[in-house]
Amino acid sequence: MIRKILLPVRGDGKGDNVFAHAATLAVRYKGHVVVAHCRPRAEDLMPYGIAISAPLRKLLLSQSANVADQVEDGMRKELESLAARFGITLSDKAIPGVATTAWIEEQGRQVDVIKRHGRLADLICVAKPDVDRNLGTNTLKAALFNTGRPVMMCPPLDSAPERLCDHVAIGWNGSVEASRAVAMTLGVLEEASEVTVLSTGAEVNGADSESLKEYLQARGVNVKLLRFKSSRKIGRDLLQHCAQVGADTLIMGAYSNSHETETVFGGATQYVVDHSGIPVILVH
């Protein structure tokens, strides 16, 4: 069951959309959303390799701190507005049976903030990377490779998702990553109205999809199995079949090859990250 959701944010304009996803989950599971804003250190904003006088340095540090204060204040007010819109209670701590959210301010590198808070979160929500603007890739990587926790990648939407984790699809290939993804999202699967296992049936040296179906049925999950013909575009096939069955969320293991290898040469995970129009819960 999802009780604590981490949402790392920065002033890139993507926080509203990701909060809408996290809020939908918080309302569904009566969870607690921790919105963690990473404030850059003023020293890190100084020109690199350029000698500047002490008075100018002091002025720049002061101006940087003022800008950071304004950004923080604006984002905090935005959170309060969004919380009211989604009917979520502002609370520093989780309240049993109530959807709540809290704002925390950290200073330093975002990857360190994600490490520190993500390792004790049931789910980490991040924006779908924007390749054109070079935004979000490092956040997704930090959450996936440095926390050991499930990460929901949230696609850009004009409004809050009407359904989330209601009809869940599982991309299954029998791998360790896929097995871990199922194990770490059992609470989601058990609460879903419907679960569809998507598989090519080619689980080499791994648990087959029929066995996964039986495993989930033993836990009371309403699950069905859809096998499809294998192609060289597994990621594309997964997304097409998600649309075919009407799944609102996809769960899959992430980057069985290295992230760099999949990014350069292509791979199922990278295709899904680049092209998915539905939320995807990734587990590495």
Each language-model region and where it sits:
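Short beta->alpha connector loops
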Residues: 12-13, 107-111, 131-132, 175-176, ...
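Electropositive phosphate-/nucleotide-binding environments in soluble metabolic enzymes
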Residues: 69, 73-76, 108, 179, ...
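Small/aliphatic-rich secondary-structure junction motif
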Residues: 1-61, 146, 156, 164-229
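Short, small-residue-enriched loops and turns at beta-alpha junctions
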Residues: 132, 202-206, 231-232, 258-259
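Gly/Ser-rich helix-loop-strand patches that form or flank binding pockets
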Residues: 15, 19, 26, 111-161, ...
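Structural beta-alpha unit
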Residues: 40-43, 73, 81-124, 219-250, ...
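Hydrophobic/aromatic beta-strand patches that form the interior of the parallel beta-sheet core
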Residues: 34-36, 104, 125, 152, ...
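A short acidic, glycine-rich active-site loop
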Residues: 57-74
